[in-house]
Amino acid sequence: EEVCRMMQTATRIYDRTIVAVFKENRKALRDLVRESEDIYRDSRKLRAGLMPTLRRLKGAGLELSLYYIQMVDYLSEIAEALVHITRPTFEHIDNNHEGLSREQATDLMHINDDVAEIYGSINRILVTNDFSEIDSVLSMREDLFERIAATTKSELVRINEGEGNTKASILYLTILSETRTMVLQARNLLKAQRYFSEHADARMGRVRYTRNS
């Protein structure tokens, strides 16, 4: 439940950050930095509180404990990547640096749409515990990674040709890199959640069989 909540919050923060940087909305970005730092602290608290949870899972087998640790680690990586997007974005706008170019804004808009679709599918899977969409998520992730790679290459070409603003380019490339990290770790979290659920269901089946024998 906590993982689902934090993933949904991360989805909202990312989308609002991309919109706020388009509009150069300083106040919104300041609030989003605070929210992303809050979710990062929450993920670290989950990590710090692993031992009590692992003790509760002790009787459930080593595999469940391992997958739970992985889930918490991936969630922390997602939250950290989000901070690495919101913080420099706010600082860029707060320091009155030049905003993103039309090309950068257009590319980020498409990437934001892709991220929203991927995270929407992941959140739906986490809530319903129905993993039938997992191959579709993998396919969407690969398409997004190809888009990010092509977009990064285009930006490097523009930089080499002396086009655009250096600080805006650095911010743009940072957002692209951290977006890739966010999606990569979200997919990893989903895989860990699937294995966790499968082992939990298998163990519950064994427990029911033993009790009925």
What are these regions (language model features)?
Residues E1-S213:
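Cytosolic, long alpha-helical scaffolding segments
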